[in-house]
């Protein structure tokens, strides 16, 4: 009991709020503490992710401290003190809040019927609760010129209330000082320096922060109202982190994608690629089955598929790491049914061999426990935007050193760039470098993040990451950042990379959803092969080499389980019903499995999701049967060329993103900005 009382004396203080006594943590502001107690204090400028500004004066509370006079203070900047008395709803506060709302409405246009923020506007809600029912303004309203903010954000600056959330978001989270306030007094306005567009990997989140309709989404403008939309939960399938999202749709059309709060992954943010990925499903789509470029029926295509599978000729199925765990599981079962069938991946052999179960870290553990972070062949600002944001937040609020082993590139994190080749990096991790040898020995919070994109480079294949990392005492497990949404699941399924000999020996080649990256596409185009069946959602250069092309159901028409970079299983939910023309990989593979009743495993297939999600499978590797081998011992085979970054463009990092007009426009604006700087 003594320890418990001492704990509360140190960590907790007693305060009085609205004549009720509460115990609350130290070092909390009055606004944060009241929110923790479930008491509502109105605000406009305060946000949990940003620093305190105190611009709006809407969060006023009355404070009584001992014998001092009772006075109103700003609750977002006032910390809780012991024996403090706080009043939240006095006549003085009601009048002050009404005056603040009236002042904000003096120059605010009355265009709520045409505003995209209507129904979700903080100014509307707080005017109804705290505002007055009459107007004393008899002058003309001020007009402010709209700024060109790029292809994502639409500005109507006459609605701006100068909360400066967007300014602080750009400076503190994005690391760019594009926005700021100009002029003074009544003529104050938010503007961008040199009229630069808002271009960042997280710039779409500014719209979510804006409490009024000054900043809205350009693709969403004048399309629908928020109360007309249905909402479904899902995950981001554009990177390996798997951010949680809300999908807003009406009928058969997706109108916008918003972040879902998940403190372990994406917090309250999502990348622009995740926000506008749905636009790629509207362009360059396969809409009907094709036979040598001409339309054909689905039944005839299924007959040809069944005929090819049942023949004794060798078949090759090529897939990538963007398909779900259920499809990978069914592909494994298909090989047990048909001995003439081989399943290969387009992922390089290096990635498969260097992955093992122990090399799986956690994003939260790396961010919280690391004091020195090593980035190997990784551009976080392109390949994992949200992890880059978390490391930047750690750097700004605590001590964190970031060392990037790659050539120099623009980043919003303060990093030390060390341009080494794979051989020198191997010597460095062994402690043969004076500076880093001492750093590895003395640093308690040492963490490592490995990129997957630049590991395609020829010559790094002999670098055994496994053996190197076993000798280093990392504070957390190293983390591999993949390129696709199920890159960890593809590694655990132990699919081997295809070779040129596999393609030449196969009679028919099946291609399943092959649009992962430009590297894999180039390798397939250079391979002399005849593709028999092409299954995908979009056209591609490989589709021209296929005899049969079948449209696949989009990611929003199917559900599936995906493993993110932490090997965390997450469910992508189905939003729309699949039409009669498109094909689902689940249904296609189950159809092929059902034609052999003597080996029917449908009682087993009905439990496939529970089997895949069983934690013991990932711990013991019962089905996947993954083994780690040491294959790199000869330093002569290691490349002597320095590592170079491959992914420079966040918006077009995958082939599917190249079909989105919104992301293409973002990429063009980014290239224009880079050309102007140099």
Would you name each region that the model predicts?
Residues 46, 332, 368, 381-389, ...:
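A cross-kingdom feature strongest in bacterial/archaeal respiratory oxidoreductases
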Residues 202-259, 368-400, 405, 515, ...:
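Phosphate/diphosphate-binding loops
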């Amino acid at each position: 009991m003594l320890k418990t009382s001492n704990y509360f004396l140190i960590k907790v203080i007693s305060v009085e709020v609205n004549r009720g006594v509460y115990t609350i943590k130290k070092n909390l502001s009055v606004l944060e503490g009241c929110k923790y107690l479930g008491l509502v204090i109105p605000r406009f400028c305060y946000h949990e992710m940003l620093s305190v500004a105190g611009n709006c004066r809407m969060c006023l509370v009355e404070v009584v401290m001992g014998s001092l006079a009772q006075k109103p203070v700003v609750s977002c900047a006032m910390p809780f003190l012991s024996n403090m008395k706080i009043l939240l709803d006095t006549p003085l506060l009601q009048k002050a809040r009404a005056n603040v709302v009236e002042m904000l409405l003096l120059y605010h246009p009355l265009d709520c019927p045409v505003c995209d923020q209507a129904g979700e506007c903080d100014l509307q809600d707080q005017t109804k609760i705290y505002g007055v029912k009459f107007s004393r303004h008899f002058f003309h309203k001020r007009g402010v010129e709209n700024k060109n903010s790029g292809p994502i954000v639409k500005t109507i600056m006459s609605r701006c209330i100068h909360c400066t959330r967007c300014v602080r978001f750009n400076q503190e989270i994005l690391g760019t000082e594009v926005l700021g306030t100009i002029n003074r007094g009544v003529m104050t306005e938010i503007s961008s320096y040199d009229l630069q567009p808002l271009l960042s990997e997280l710039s779409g989140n500014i719209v979510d922060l804006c409490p009024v309709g000054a900043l809205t989404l350009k693709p969403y403008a004048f399309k629908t109202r928020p109360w007309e939309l249905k909402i479904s939960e899902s995950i981001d399938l554009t990177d390996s982190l798997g951010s949680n999202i809300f999908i807003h749709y009406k009928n058969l059309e997706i109108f916008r994608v918003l972040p879902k709060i998940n403190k372990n992954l994406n917090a309250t943010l999502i990348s622009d690629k995740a926000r506008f990925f749905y636009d790629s499903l509207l362009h360059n789509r396969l809409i009907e089955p094709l036979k040598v470029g001409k339309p054909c029926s689905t039944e005839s295509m299924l007959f040809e598929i069944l005929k090819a599978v049942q023949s004794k000729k060798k078949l090759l199925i090529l897939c990538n790491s963007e398909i779900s765990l259920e499809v990978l599981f069914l592909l494994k079962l298909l090989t047990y049914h048909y001995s003439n069938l081989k399943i290969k991946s387009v992922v390089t052999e290096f990635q498969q061999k260097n992955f093992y179960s122990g090399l799986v870290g956690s994003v939260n553990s790396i961010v919280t426990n690391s004091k020195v972070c090593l980035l190997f062949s990784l551009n976080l600002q392109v390949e994992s935007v949200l992890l880059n944001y978390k490391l930047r937040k750690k750097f700004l609020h605590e001590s964190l050193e970031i060392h990037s082993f790659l050539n120099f590139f623009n980043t919003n994190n303060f990093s030390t760039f060390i341009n080494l080749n794979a051989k020198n990096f191997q010597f460095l991790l062994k402690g043969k470098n004076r500076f880093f040898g001492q750093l590895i020995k003395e640093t308690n919070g040492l963490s490592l993040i490995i990129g997957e994109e630049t590991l395609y480079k020829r010559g790094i294949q002999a670098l055994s990451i496994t053996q190197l990392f076993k000798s280093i005492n990392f504070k957390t497990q190293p983390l591999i950042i993949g390129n696709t949404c199920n890159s960890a699941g593809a590694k655990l399924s132990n699919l081997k990379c295809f070779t040129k000999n596999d393609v030449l020996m196969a009679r028919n080649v099946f291609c399943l959803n092959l649009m992962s990256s430009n590297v894999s596409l180039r390798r397939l185009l250079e391979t002399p092969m005849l593709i028999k069946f092409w299954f995908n959602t979009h056209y591609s250069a490989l589709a021209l080499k296929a005899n049969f092309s079948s449209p696949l159901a989009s990611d929003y028409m199917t559900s599936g389980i995906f493993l993110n970079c932490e090997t965390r299983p997450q469910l992508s939910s189905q939003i729309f019903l699949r039409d009669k023309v498109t094909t689902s990989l689940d249904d296609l593979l189950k159809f092929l499995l059902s034609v052999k009743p003597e080996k029917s495993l449908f009682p087993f297939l009905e439990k496939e999701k529970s089997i895949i999600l069983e934690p013991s499978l990932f711990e013991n590797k019962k089905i996947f049967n993954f083994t780690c081998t040491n294959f790199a011992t000869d330093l002569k085979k290691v490349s002597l060329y320095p590592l170079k970054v491959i992914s420079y463009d966040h918006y077009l990092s995958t082939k599917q993103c190249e079909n989105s007009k919104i992301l293409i426009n973002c990429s063009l604006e980014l290239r224009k900005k880079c050309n102007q700087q140099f």
